[in-house]
Amino acid sequence: MKHLLLIFFVLLCAATACLGETWSLVVCHSNDVHGGVDSSEATFMNPEFPPQLGGGASAATLISYMRHYCHTKGDGFLLLDTGDIFQGTLVGTKTKGDAVVRYMNEVGYDAWVLGNHEFDVGRAVPEKLMTEADFSVLSANIYDTTGGVYTHFAKPYLIKDYGKLKIGVVGITTAGTVREAFKENIKNLYFAPEVTTLAAYRDTLRALGCDIVIAATHLGLPFDRWEAYDDVEKREKEGWKSDYAKNTMELVRRVPGIDILFAGDIHVGYQEPWVDPVNHTPCFQGYGRGTNLLAVEFEFDLTTRKLIGWKNFQDEGTLITLMSDRFPRDRSVAQSIDTVAGRVEKGFNDKIGESVIPITRTGEGESLMGNLICDAMLWKMKGDVAITNKGGVRTDIHAGTITPHDVFDVLPFDNTLGTVEVTGAFVKDLLEAKVIYGGSGLYVSGMRVKVDRSRPAGQRVISLEIFGKPVVADSSYRLVTTDYLLEGNSGMEKLASLRSQAAIESGVYMRDAVLEYIKEHSPIEPKLDGRWQTLDAKP
């Protein structure tokens, strides 16, 4: 596989030796910002002494530089975001995206593709933000079905005519939103298959005279590119089962004729693009939370009107970390963001407790953070067992002082807690359904689970204990979980029927339970206690 990519780049370089006139386009791209436009600390670089990140104000400085660079060279410039712009920080969440869209207006974004988290608090929020945006809001595969008529919820595409070349950008939102959002929040919305939608709008843009077609997708590049590519080849060999794509890697394999793709949804940055070895589409993706900006200069042959190569602006690759000492914060943008931050963060920086150790999400089956959260859920609701989904747990907590701001960053979604009486057999079936595809995607408390991945589906939970004893199939247990899972999201369809029949919903916010738990038990020191063990786990 790596050999094939090397051959492709050798051929690409050889082709550039006999070029005619060329023209360049610089693209700056962000994804999964999740409200991260304010300043923050780069704890992922150095947990003990983190460098300062300038957020949107540092991005504004870099964007201004890139625009000037393009102007002096006569190049084109394009600024894109591929979704999940606001939900995740106080600045983003408390303003319901207003502060983020104002920032995007100020720095001159060309387009924003709707992400699944845009619908976390209802469709009215993205609808309002679309009216505030001075740029195109894209999604070719979301349809409003109100009144039985299918109409586009957002614009399907953007066409930019640079004179030298006409470039079309088609936006795609993950159809998995229907599994990840509350049903009420996406009422009367239809998410069409990504594969057929992208193919159709590729043809539309070509018919409208676009020389270059760019796909901007809120459908991500995977964490492990080689494992995922093996899966793509396997699925292709077996025959595609639907018109929905599992990830961007599959999408570009199934839809040829896309010149460039920018991805989002999965928070892993690719310093160098993934290039599909069959269709040769380069795919780019950055890290999330506004920590970086992706910047690439693409070169096109004006005779063939084809992409002939690209280059980065730094040796490390395409992703530029927005450190404030390297990119001083733009004063005007900084003032706008800091004013909002000062208003929404009042009281959120007060001390509520301490942690003896860093509380991280690291771990295949359990983690310090997951154990803390589920233990807090169990404590608050006086349950027997507790479960929550890993996807709702967004960051780590450093050692030392803990504030409400820290807890909010970990749990930015307004999930509430509920309880339901279930049998031991139901708990086991619930877990079996979650491990059928490998990992569980769950954090738990009150139980000890042992999973053997090598066993057939439905038989992988080889040990389940509650109260330190083997689970009794027909005994009743009080299960604590979130309203999100009680609706059947994140693969928990088995819970959906119980919500209306037997669930008791408290209205207590999940993060408030964690706040109270930390206050009550401070200083805290969560431990890994073997509550979730996986045999045959991949390293």
Predicted regions and their residues:
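Short, compositionally biased low-complexity segments
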Residues: 30-35, 174-176, 309-311, 342-354, ...
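Acidic, metal/ion-coordinating pockets
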Residues: 20-321, 364, 368-376, 386, ...
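Hard-cation-handling environments
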Residues: 307, 311-402
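Extreme N-terminus of proteins, especially the signal/transit-peptide cleavage junction
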Residues: 16-23, 344
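Feature captures C-terminal
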Residues: 24-26, 36, 49, 54, ...
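Bacterial N-terminal signal peptides
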Residues: 6-15
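Positively charged n-region of N-terminal signal peptides that target proteins for export
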Residues: 1-4
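Alpha-helix initiation and N-capping motif
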Residues: 56, 97, 123, 248, ...
